[in-house]
Curated annotation (Swiss-Prot):
PANTHER family: CCCTC-BINDING FACTOR LIKE, KRAB AND ZINC FINGER DOMAIN-CONTAINING. InterPro entries: Znf_C2H2_sf, Znf_C2H2_type. Residues 608-620 have a biased composition (Low complexity). Pfam families: zf-C2H2 (PF00096). The keyword Transport does not apply. Residues 24-55, 221-250, 569-630 are annotated as: Disordered. This is Transcriptional repressor CTCFL. Gene3D superfamilies: Classic Zinc Finger. Keywords: Activator, Cell cycle, Chromatin regulator, Cytoplasm, DNA-binding, Metal-binding, Nucleus, Repeat, Repressor, Transcription, Transcription regulation, Zinc, Zinc-finger. Residues 580-590 have a biased composition (Basic residues). Residues 24-51, 594-607 have a biased composition (Basic and acidic residues).
C-alpha cells in the first residue's frame, strides 16, 4: 500500500507548509524552484478518513496542509518528537517551557522524512489521554536548533497529498493501517475533545543518540480546555492589544492625581498610593525584632536595617554609607555637590531639603501652625514645638557627662561642655566682632548668619531703622532694651523684656501653665516648678545652704544671706530665713515706726511741760499711753523731765530716746 510506495522514495523528503484555503477551485499546480505544490478539495472518502486521523487534528488551524515531495539534501538532521497531552487550563503551569503561537512564518521549512515502519508510530495509553509521537528531521542550515524555541509547528490536518515528478498519488492517513491503529471510541473521544480545546505546543531540547550528532526536540501538543465564559484566543489578544494601547496613551498623557483629603498632587500613581496610606491608621507590616509596625514594606526594610546595622546605600565620593536612599541624597548635597534644588519664590533662599523650604516660606507668610496646648506659644515647625513642650514638663534629656548638669537642648549641652570643661579647647574669635566661639563650624555659621551682606532690608522691631547686616541690626536693637517698652494693660507695671510681661500678666489672669507631673501642682513660673520638683520629688536633691561668714547662720536662699550679712555684727536685729521670720520682722518694723511717731509726740509734750505747762505734758503722756499701752513709761521717768528737755533742745534723735528707754 502507501507504505510500500513511500519506501521507494528513500532519498526524498516531504515538506509541510501551510496553505491558504481556496474553496470552489480545483487542483492547480505551481512550479517554483523545482518544487511542486498542489491544492485540492476534500472528497467524501477523505472526510471519512479525517475521523481516523484524530491524532493529527488541530483545532487551531483551519487551513489545509499538503505534503509535497522534494529532492533530499545531505545534511545533519534533528529528530522532533510530537506528543499530545490533555489537561485543563487550571492545571497548566507554564514553567521553563516556550509557548508557540500559531502564525504563518514563511522563512521556516519543516522537512519530514519518508515515513517508514519505525518512523511514525502510536503508543496506546489510557482512553482519556491519547499520546502520539512523530519523529521529524529538520535540516540545520534551514533552521538551527538554538532557534527552535520560537519555531512554529503546523499540525497535520485531514488527508495528505503526496506528489512525485511522474505521478500524483493521494495518500490518506487512514490507509496507513500499518502505522496507525486507532480504536473507534478513542477517535470519538478525541474528536469531541479537540473541538473544545485549544492546542498549545511546548518544545524541549535533549541530546540524541551517543553515536550520532543528533539533537532531539520534544514538541508537546497540549490541548487546554477553554472556559465557557472566557473569550477566544483571538478576542483575548485583541483586547490585550487594545488595553496596552490605552495604557500607553494614559501614560503619555501624564495625568495628575489629586488627594481628596489634603492638597497633595502627584503625576505618579505609586507616589499617590504611598501618600494615601498616610491618611489611614493601618500599619500591616510588623518588625519581628521590636514589634513596631509600618505602613509600607520600604519603611519596614529601612527600620530593620537599623537593627542589623546594614547600610546598603554607599556614597561614591567618600566611605560613608546610609540606611536609606534619602539620607544618601541629602549627604551628597550637603558634602559633595552642594546642590540646593528647593528655591523660594519670594526671595533668594535655597535649601537642600523640601521641609526646610516649607519652614522658610512660613517666615514670609507669618504662619505658625504648630500651637502649644498649654500656653499661647506657636511655632513654624514641629521641632521647636517639641523643644518648647519641655519647658512645661520640666524634662531635661541631655546630661553633661562631667558635671551631670542637665539641659533641654543638645546644642546647649555642647556649648556648656566646651565653655566649662574645655580647658585646652582652641578658641576661635570672629574677625568682625569680639565673639569667641569654641568650634570652627560654629564660627562659620556665626559669620554667615550675622556678618553676611543681605540684599533684603532688615527692619528694626522698635523703630523704622533699616539694615543690611544682621549683626548691625542686633546691636541697634540693644539700644532699645533700656526702655521699659512693655506696659501692663491692667496696672501701671512696665518692664524691658516681653517674657517678664508675660509672667506678670499671669498674676492678673491667674494662669498657671507649669504643672508638676508628680503631684499636679501648678505654677506661674518655670523656676518655681523646678524648685518645687527638686525639693519635694527629687530623692537625690541636696539643698544648698548659704552660711554667714560672721555668725555661721545658714540660709536656703542667697538673697536671705545677703540681707542678713548687711545687718550681721552691727547690733541690729538679725533677719530670719523663713517666711514666718520675715512676717515677724515686718511686724516689728511697723511697731517701731509707730513707736517712734508716738515718741516724737511725747517729746513735744515734755518740752511743753518744761516750759511750765505741766497739764499739757501729762495729757500728752496719757495720750501716748492709750495708743501704745505696752510702751508706757514708768513713773520714775518723770523725774528726768528736765534732763530730757535739755537733750531735746540739743537735737535728740529717736534712736537716742529708745536707748534711754532701754536703760
Amino acid at each position: 500500500m502507501a507504505a510500500t510506495e513511500i519506501s521507494v522514495l528513500s532519498e526524498q523528503f516531504t515538506k509541510i507548509k501551510e496553505l491558504e484555503l481556496m474553496p470552489e477551485k480545483g487542483l492547480k499546480e505551481e512550479e517554483k524552484d523545482g518544487v511542486c505544490r498542489e491544492k485540492d478539495h476534500r472528497s467524501p472518502s477523505e472526510l471519512e478518513a479525517e475521523r481516523t486521523s484524530g491524532a493529527f487534528q488541530d483545532s487551531v488551524l483551519e487551513e489545509e496542509v499538503e505534503l509535497v515531495l522534494a529532492p533530499s539534501e545531505e545534511s545533519e538532521k534533528y529528530i522532533l518528537t510530537l506528543q499530545t497531552v490533555h489537561f485543563t487550563s487550571e492545571a497548566v503551569e507554564l514553567q521553563d517551557m516556550s509557548l508557540l503561537s500559531i502564525q504563518q512564518q514563511e522563512g521556516v521549512q519543516v522537512v519530514v522524512q519518508q515515513p517508514g515502519p519505525g518512523l511514525l508510530w502510536l503508543e496506546e495509553g489510557p482512553r482519556q489521554s491519547l499520546q502520539q509521537c512523530v519523529a521529524i528531521s529538520i535540516q540545520q542550515e534551514l533552521y538551527s536548533p538554538q532557534e527552535m524555541e520560537v519555531l512554529q509547528f503546523h499540525a497535520l490536518e485531514e488527508n495528505v497529498m503526496v506528489a512525485s515528478e511522474d505521478s500524483k498519488l493521494a495518500v490518506s492517513l487512514a490507509e496507513t493501517t500499518g502505522l496507525i491503529k486507532l480504536e473507534e471510541e478513542q477517535e470519538k473521544n478525541q474528536l469531541l475533545a479537540e473541538r473544545t480545546k485549544e492546542q498549545l505546543f511546548f518544545v524541549e531540547t535533549m541530546s540524541g543518540d551517543e553515536r550520532s550528532d543528533e539533537i532531539v526536540l520534544t514538541v508537546s501538543n497540549s490541548n487546554v480546555e477553554e472556559q465557557e465564559d472566557q473569550p477566544t484566543a483571538g478576542q483575548a489578544d485583541a483586547e490585550k492589544a487594545k488595553s496596552t494601547k490605552n495604557q500607553r496613551k494614559t501614560k503619555g498623557a501624564k495625568g495628575t492625581f489629586h488627594c481628596d483629603v489634603c492638597m497633595f498632587t502627584s503625576s505618579r500613581m505609586s507616589s499617590f498610593n504611598r501618600h494615601m496610606k498616610t491618611h489611614t491608621s493601618e500599619k500591616p507590616h510588623l518588625c519581628h525584632l521590636c514589634l513596631k509596625t509600618f505602613r509600607t514594606v520600604t519603611l519596614l526594610r529601612n527600620h530593620v536595617n537599623t537593627h542589623t546595622g546594614t547600610r546598603p546605600y554607599k556614597c561614591n565620593d567618600c566611605n560613608m554609607a546610609f540606611v536609606t536612599s534619602g539620607e544618601l541624597v541629602r549627604h551628597r548635597r550637603y558634602k559633595h555637590t552642594h546642590e540646593k534644588p528647593f528655591k523660594c519664590s519670594m526671595c533668594k533662599y535655597a535649601s537642600v531639603e523640601a521641609s526646610k523650604l516649607k519652614r522658610h516660606v512660613r517666615s514670609h507668610t507669618g504662619e505658625r501652625p504648630f500651637q502649644c496646648c498649654q500656653c499661647s506659644y506657636a511655632s513654624r515647625d514641629t521641632y521647636k514645638l517639641k523643644r518648647h513642650m519641655r519647658t512645661h514638663s520640666g524634662e531635661k534629656p541631655y546630661e553633661c557627662h562631667i558635671c551631670h548638669t542637665r539641659f533641654t537642648q543638645s546644642g546647649t549641652m555642647k556649648i556648656h561642655i566646651l565653655q566649662k570643661h574645655g580647658e585646652n579647647v582652641p578658641k576661635y574669635q570672629c574677625p568682625h566682632c569680639a565673639t569667641i566661639i569654641a568650634r570652627k563650624s560654629d564660627l562659620r555659621v556665626h559669620m554667615r548668619n550675622l556678618h553676611a551682606y543681605s540684599a533684603a532690608e532688615l527692619k528694626c522691631r522698635y523703630c523704622s531703622a533699616v539694615f543690611h547686616e544682621r549683626y548691625a541690626l542686633i546691636q541697634h536693637q540693644k539700644t532699645h532694651k533700656n526702655e521699659k517698652r512693655f506696659k501692663c494693660k491692667h496696672c501701671s507695671y512696665a518692664c524691658k523684656q516681653e517674657r517678664h510681661m508675660t509672667a506678670h500678666i499671669r498674676t492678673h489672669t491667674g494662669e498657671k501653665p507649669f504643672t508638676c507631673l508628680s503631684c499636679n501642682k501648678c505654677f506661674r513660673q518655670k523656676q518655681l516648678l523646678n524648685a518645687h520638683f527638686r525639693k519635694y520629688h527629687d530623692a537625690n536633691f541636696i539643698p544648698t545652704v548659704y552660711k554667714c561668714s560672721k555668725c555661721g547662720k545658714g540660709f536656703s536662699r542667697w538673697i536671705n544671706l545677703h540681707r542678713h550679712s548687711e545687718k550681721c555684727g552691727s547690733g541690729e536685729a538679725k533677719s530670719a530665713a523663713s517666711g514666718k521670720g520675715r512676717r515677724t520682722r515686718k511686724r516689728k518694723q511697723t511697731i517701731l515706726k509707730e513707736a517712734t511717731k508716738g515718741q516724737k509726740e511725747a517729746a513735744k509734750g515734755w518740752k511743753e511741760a518744761a516750759n511750765g505747762d505741766e497739764a499739757a505734758a501729762e495729757e500728752a503722756s496719757t495720750t501716748k499711753g492709750e495708743q501704745f499701752p505696752g510702751e508706757m513709761f514708768p513713773v520714775a521717768c518723770r523725774e528726768t523731765t528736765a534732763r530730757v528737755k535739755e537733750e531735746v533742745d540739743e537735737g535728740v534723735t529717736c534712736e537716742m530716746l529708745l536707748n534711754t528707754m532701754d536703760k
